[in-house]
Design a protein with these regions (language model features):
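Structured surface patches comprising rigid loops and adjacent beta-strands/short helices at the edges
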Residues: 46, 61, 68-81
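Short, exposed beta-strand/loop patches in secreted or surface proteins that constitute
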Residues: 11-13, 43-48
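Short, contiguous, helix-prone interaction/anchoring segments in small proteins
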Residues: 29-41, 49
Length: 81
C-alpha cells in the first residue's frame, strides 16, 4: 500500500468506517490454522498501530475462533470499505 492509500485508509478507519475486505500481497498462515490466506472478508476490530502495522480480527478456519492478525502496511495489496 502506498503512502497516499495508507493515509486514506487511516482516515477512513479512524472516522469509524467499516473495512469489508483486506487483500495481502502474499499468503499468510495463521497460527493453528491449516489454510493459507491472503484475502480477508469482513475483518473485525481493524486497528491502525503506531509502528506502521494494522491489526484486525478474523475467524480461524480450523478452530472457528476469532484470531488477531497483525501485518505491516507494506503487505497490504488492496482493501474495501
Amino acid at each position: 500500500m502506498g503512502t497516499r492509500d495508507y493515509e486514506n485508509f487511516k482516515r477512513e478507519v479512524n472516522s469509524g468506517k467499516r473495512v469489508t475486505y483486506i487483500k495481502l500481497r502474499d499468503f499468510q498462515i495463521l497460527e493453528n490454522d491449516s489454510y493459507p490466506r491472503r484475502e480477508f472478508r469482513e475483518p473485525r476490530n481493524v486497528t491502525i498501530n503506531n509502528d506502521n502495522t494494522i491489526s484486525f480480527d478474523v475467524e480461524n478456519w480450523t478452530t472457528f475462533k476469532s484470531q488477531t492478525v497483525t501485518v505491516n502496511v507494506s503487505e497490504i495489496d488492496s482493501f474495501s470499505f
